[in-house]
């Protein structure tokens, strides 16, 4: 299709009556936000993605393929709609209306910004990122998160090219663009228009090949995405002073361990985690220890598993070296606690909230479990392997408590549900231990 045919029905709209007219009668609406940092955070480009440090600049809406309107709310130039009128109108007409399906690409993002305004998206809703990950990208492989961006899906599935944020903004924030500039309008409108097109395309695919997946997207994954946005917005309250205090204690402990290691091996550079080439050369060339494991590039491995194997070998053949490996393993443990959990968590403490707001990804693992990133708050070390007390950094807000819950044997339980194996079902129904029942066979 020509560029004219793709973008000819996009327009900027600031009149509430015209906005209402455009949406009238539609039972499915796609929407997308453009955001920009608040004045105090303009030196951080990533702040535009943070609902605590940025604001909604405008919203685009699409009710028919090839058609969309852009409603500017907080542009410096070109004029804006009255947000005090538009936001309540869209809240009632779209976001909380049970008669309208709300479509967005990355619904968690939109949910987070609406929650900042006191609005929680109500079903029915549809996240096209979730839908993308529930479809096959080839005959044997489902799409991953990296395959599910709008700018990647549109050329692949619809054969069109979308304007990029960088091309349109040229290093500026979105609120610095003229709200009525055709390129501004084209960029903003394309996101909601193509979210709606993908919604239709994915549903056609589901209906033809995997109808159950459409049900899952509409009734499980998309509502979950809304609450992922809420959870990200709320974040985790962190004891930052305690983290800084422990950071110093860890640094002192690492220095102490490094000095003890140096007393055994001299001036060999062990680096931050005893994984340097110099240390490996010392182990395998100077000490002439056996290479028990190699890397993918056929080099000597020196990971935790390898060091454990070497320590066991030395206990039998070179017992005088066992204390060295004990020190190195202790050094690595403290190094990981400091770099991954203390230094790593401190980098993500939001200056506006004093909290960490990780991304929560419901479909990012092959097992179906949630994943988290920026940072990964799901892999806090167990207390038995944590002399620092990392989990104690996470605080309950005043008047609240933290509750730890865990599914019991969830994968096997799901397997029993689907395969209907009589013995597995009986074990669960009688409160037995499925692992004990398996090993007794």
Q: Predicted segment positions?
A:
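Conserved "right-hand" nucleotidyltransferase catalytic core of DNA-directed polymerases
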Residues: 1-74, 141-145, 153, 157, ...
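Acidic beta-strand-to-loop metal/phosphate-binding motif
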Residues: 30, 99-107, 402-404
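Nucleic-acid-processing active sites and adjacent nucleic-acid-binding tracks
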Residues: 64-102, 438
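A short, basic-hydrophobic beta/loop patch
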Residues: 74, 426-437, 441
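Phosphate- and divalent-cation-binding pockets in alpha/beta enzyme and binding domains
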Residues: 109-116, 282, 414
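Conserved beta-strand -> loop -> alpha-helix junction used to position metal-binding or nucleic-acid-contacting
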Residues: 120-137, 150-151, 431-435
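Cytochrome P450 catalytic domain signature, combining two hallmark sequence patches
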Residues: 123, 289-294, 419-430
């Amino acid at each position: 299709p020509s560029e004219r045919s793709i973008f000819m029905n996009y327009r900027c709209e600031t009149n509430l009556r015209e906005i209402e007219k455009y949406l009238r009668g539609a039972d499915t609406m796609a929407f997308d936000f453009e955001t920009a940092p608040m004045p105090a955070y303009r030196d951080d480009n990533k702040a535009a993605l943070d609902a605590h440090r940025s604001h909604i600049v405008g919203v685009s809406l699409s009710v028919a393929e090839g058609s969309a309107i852009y409603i500017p709310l907080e542009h410096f130039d070109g004029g804006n709609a009255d947000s005090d009128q538009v936001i309540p109108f869209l809240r009632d007409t779209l976001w909380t209306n049970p008669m309208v399906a709300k479509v967005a690409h990355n619904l968690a993002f939109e949910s987070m910004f609406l929650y900042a305004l006191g609005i929680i998206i109500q079903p029915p809703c549809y996240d096209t990122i979730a839908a993308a990950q529930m479809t096959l990208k080839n005959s044997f492989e489902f799409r991953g998160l990296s395959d599910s961006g709008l700018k990647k899906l549109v050329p692949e599935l619809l054969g069109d090219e979308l304007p990029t944020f960088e091309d349109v903004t040229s290093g500026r924030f979105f609120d610095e663009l003229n709200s009525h500039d055709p390129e501004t309008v084209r960029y903003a409108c394309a996101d909601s228009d193509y979210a709606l097109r993908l919604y239709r395309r994915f549903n056609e695919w589901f209906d033809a090949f995997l109808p159950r997946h459409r049900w899952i997207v509409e009734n499980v994954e998309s509502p979950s995405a809304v609450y992922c946005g809420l959870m990200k917005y709320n974040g985790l309250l962190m004891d930052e002073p305690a983290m800084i205090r422990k950071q110093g204690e860890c640094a002192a402990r690492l220095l102490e361990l490094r000095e003890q290691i140096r007393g055994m091996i001299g001036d060999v550079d062990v680096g931050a985690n005893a994984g340097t080439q110099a240390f490996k050369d010392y182990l395998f060339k100077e000490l002439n220890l056996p290479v028990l494991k190699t890397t993918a590039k056929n080099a000597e491995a020196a990971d935790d598993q390898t060091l454990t194997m070497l320590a066991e070998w030395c206990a039998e053949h070179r017992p005088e070296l066992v204390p060295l490996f004990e020190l190195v393993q202790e050094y690595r443990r403290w190094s990981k606690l400091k770099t991954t959990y203390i230094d790593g968590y401190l980098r993500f403490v939001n200056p506006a909230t004093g909290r960490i707001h990780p991304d929560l990804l419901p479909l990012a693992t092959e097992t179906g479990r949630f994943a988290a990133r920026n940072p990964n708050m799901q892999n806090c070390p167990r207390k038995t392997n944590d002399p620092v007390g990392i989990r104690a950094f996470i605080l309950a807000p005043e008047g609240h408590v933290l509750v730890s819950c865990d599914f019991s044997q969830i994968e096997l339980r799901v397997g029993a549900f689907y395969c209907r194996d009589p013995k597995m079902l009986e074990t669960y129904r009688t409160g037995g231990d499925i692992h004990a029942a398996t090993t007794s066979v």
